[in-house]
Curated annotation (Swiss-Prot):
Enzyme class: oxidoreductase
Reactions catalysed according to its record: 2 a quinone + NADH + H(+) = 2 a 1,4-benzosemiquinone + NAD(+); N,N-dimethyl-1,4-phenylenediamine + anthranilate + 2 NAD(+) = 2-(4-dimethylaminophenyl)diazenylbenzoate + 2 NADH + 2 H(+)
Subunit details: Homodimer.
Protein's recorded name: FMN-dependent NADH:quinone oxidoreductase
Species of the source: Ruegeria pomeroyi (strain ATCC 700808 / DSM 15171 / DSS-3)
Enzyme Commission number(s) of this protein: 1.6.5.-, 1.7.1.17
Keyword Endoplasmic reticulum appears in the UniProt entry: no
Any one GO MF annotation of this record: oxidoreductase activity, acting on NAD(P)H, quinone or similar compound as acceptor
Gene3D superfamilies: 3.40.50.360
Cofactor(s) listed: FMN
Binding site for FMN: S10, S16, K17, S18
Cofactor comment: Binds 1 FMN per subunit.
Length: 204
């Protein structure tokens, strides 16, 4: 049985194109595999703990800085529970709108919580990072209202898909498909662009 984790990064519900496209992809996958297990993670409804003093200090113990104590261990247990949910997925699906050239802050918060040594990555002083999540894949729907590939710099920059590509590579997920719906506000026929993205996702 395949487990799919759908991460909802837009707060706009049914008005969000990234949500709608990701939903269509998940529905198509369900139609192809009746045993597919889908876990929906709405980052705007989830109670994500602050990654502040204790969890940050606990993380540093893996790099030889400081020591665990009961307070740090409690904070780290909360981090581990959230991270294990992500690690349990065979296929990660994200619908990600572009916010100010980057990703929504709730998604960055989530990534900062789960990107932990010994769980998502290893680190060696001589060889750098090594991703620990193997034999998994990801499908990422990226949307924007203004920026598009090849656009003049006056229309923004992409720290959106580029960041996510780097992050997936860092944690070991190299089978990543990006489907873009960009831009949605400046084209003469935005519906045609949406339909192309939808066709690519439902045919996958």
């Amino acid at each position: 049985m395949t487990k799919l984790l759908q991460i909802i990064a837009s707060p706009r519900g049914g008005d969000s194109k990234s949500n709608a496209l990701a939903d269509a992809f998940v529905a198509a996958q369900r139609a192809k595999d009746s045993t597919l297990q889908v876990d929906h993670l709405d980052l705007w409804a989830e109670d994500l703990p602050a990654f502040d003093g204790d969890p940050a200090a606990a993380k540093m113990t893996f790099f030889g800085v400081g020591q665990m104590d009961p307070s740090k261990e409690q904070a780290w247990s909360a981090v581990a529970r959230i991270t294990e949910r992500f690690m349990s997925a065979d296929h990660v699906v994200m619908g990600v709108p572009m916010w100010n050239g980057g990703i929504p802050y709730r998604l960055k918060h989530y990534i900062d919580i789960i990107t932990q040594p010994g769980m998502l990555f290893g680190f060696d002083p001589d060889n750098g990072y090594s991703g620990l999540l193997r034999n998994r894949k990801a499908t990422v729907v990226t949307t924007s209202g203004v920026w598009s590939e090849g656009a003049d710099a006056r229309f923004g920059s992409d720290f959106h898909s580029t960041y996510l590509k780097w992050w997936f590579e860092t944690i070991g997920i190299t089978d990543v498909t990006f489907v873009r719906y960009q831009p949605s506000l400046l084209t003469d026929d935005p519906q045609a662009g949406y339909d192309r993205a939808l066709a690519a996702l439902t045919a996958a």
